[in-house]
């Protein structure tokens, strides 16, 4: 279900403060976050955010077409390794 338009998009407070601080200093550095549910807002464009996948942090460069999406959409939490072989020898 989509978030109500009356409310602002959800962004974790600590993530928002880190991005705001970097924008004031006009610096670019990798921001590490565990907040996969945070919405990408326009002030994040141009930053690299390392999103937690459950095992590691995956650095993602935020571009303007990503605004409005969640951070977790760009960092997959699992790797599909393929289905089991349909080899007769493996069943015996």
Swiss-Prot record:
Entry keyword annotation includes Plastid: yes
Localization per record: Plastid
InterPro entries: Ribosomal_uS19 (IPR002222), Ribosomal_uS19_bac-type (IPR005732), Ribosomal_uS19_CS (IPR020934), Ribosomal_uS19_SF (IPR023575)
GO BP terms in the entry: ribosomal small subunit assembly; translation
Coiled-coil boundaries: none
GO cellular component: mitochondrial small ribosomal subunit; plastid
Alphabetical list of SUPFAM superfamilies matching this protein: Ribosomal protein S19
A UniProt-annotated Pfam family: Ribosomal_S19
Gene Ontology terms, MF aspect: rRNA binding; structural constituent of ribosome
Key words, A-Z: Plastid, Ribonucleoprotein, Ribosomal protein, RNA-binding, rRNA-binding
Primary role: Protein S19 forms a complex with S13 that binds strongly to the 16S ribosomal RNA.
Protein family according to the UniProt entry: Belongs to the universal ribosomal protein uS19 family.
Name assigned to this protein: Small ribosomal subunit protein uS19c
Taxonomic source organism: Cuscuta exaltata
